[in-house]
């Protein structure tokens, strides 16, 4: 079985980050977190579970602040533990794998394919879950992945596939172009030199709204209970 690691980009995800770690710590061989949170909750979770951790790097004129720069920071923490041929996943705390990535990478034929795109299923609050949500909040047992179970889609596009895993070869290139508005690849998930996507399409759940504070999500949050 091939080694599979994960880099996680997070910011103020206190309600879900420890749940994510508990779920995935035995799924990935090594996990590296880049954190832009205001407090130290995520840092303490990473220390508790032995997760590699770094704060968001400070942007510079040569390396501006965007997703490629952040993922590169987490990737650099992983490099001492990587062997050519390993796979690296790119997820966030509200993205939970349904299929086991260790089994998925073994299904990729040969060495030509260096990217695996994952099928995203969005999960949002449903009126039928309102009572359970309030109960879990009151009891201090809230876990969004146990409360919310309804898939959601927009404009008849029920799902989408995104390149969420790449094969480590040691020659990874991340963009440092500036500024964001002139950088068409700043939001790209995988390194610039990884484009050969395998045909297999595993699935992950995207708990798109796990914090129902209406000041944060408005209609995409608490409002779902009224729809």
Q: How would you label these PLM feature ranges?
A:
Residues 19-23, 44-45, 103-107:
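A short acidic, amphipathic alpha-helical/loop segment
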Residues 92-96:
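The conserved acidic donor/metal-binding loop of glycosyltransferases
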Residues 64-72, 76, 82, 98-227:
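Catalytic-site signature of metal-activated, phosphate-bearing donor transferases
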Residues 29-38, 54-57:
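Short beta-strand/loop segment that forms part of the nucleotide-sugar
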Residues 42-91:
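Active-site-proximal specificity loops/subdomain of glycosyltransferases
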Residues 2-22, 37:
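Active-site beta-to-alpha loop of glycosyltransferases that engages the nucleotide-sugar donor
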Residues 22-30:
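Short, acidic, metal-binding catalytic loop of nucleotide-sugar glycosyltransferases
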């Amino acid at each position: 079985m091939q080694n599979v690691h994960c880099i996680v980009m997070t910011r103020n995800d206190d309600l879900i980050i420890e749940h994510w770690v508990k779920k995935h710590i035995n799924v990935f061989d090594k996990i590296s977190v880049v954190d832009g949170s205001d407090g130290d909750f995520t840092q303490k979770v990473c220390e508790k579970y032995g997760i590699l951790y770094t704060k968001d790097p400070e942007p510079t004129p040569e390396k501006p602040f965007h997703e490629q720069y952040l993922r590169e920071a987490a990737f650099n923490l992983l490099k001492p533990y990587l062997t050519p041929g390993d796979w690296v996943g790119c997820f966030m705390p509200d993205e939970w794998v349904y299929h086991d990535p260790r089994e998925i990478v073994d299904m990729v034929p040969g060495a030509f394919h260096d990217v695996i795109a994952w099928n995203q299923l969005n999960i949002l609050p449903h009126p039928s879950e309102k009572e359970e949500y309030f109960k879990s909040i009151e009891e201090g047992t809230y876990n969004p992945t146990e409360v919310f179970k309804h898939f959601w889609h927009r404009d008849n596009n029920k799902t989408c596939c995104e390149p969420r895993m790449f094969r480590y070869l040691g020659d990874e290139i991340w963009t440092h172009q500036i500024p964001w508005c002139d950088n068409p690849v700043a939001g790209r998930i995988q390194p610039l030199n990884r484009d050969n996507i395998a045909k297999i399409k595993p699935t992950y759940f995207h708990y798109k709204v796990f914090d129902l504070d209406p000041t944060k999500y408005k209609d995409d949050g608490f409002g779902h209970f009224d729809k």
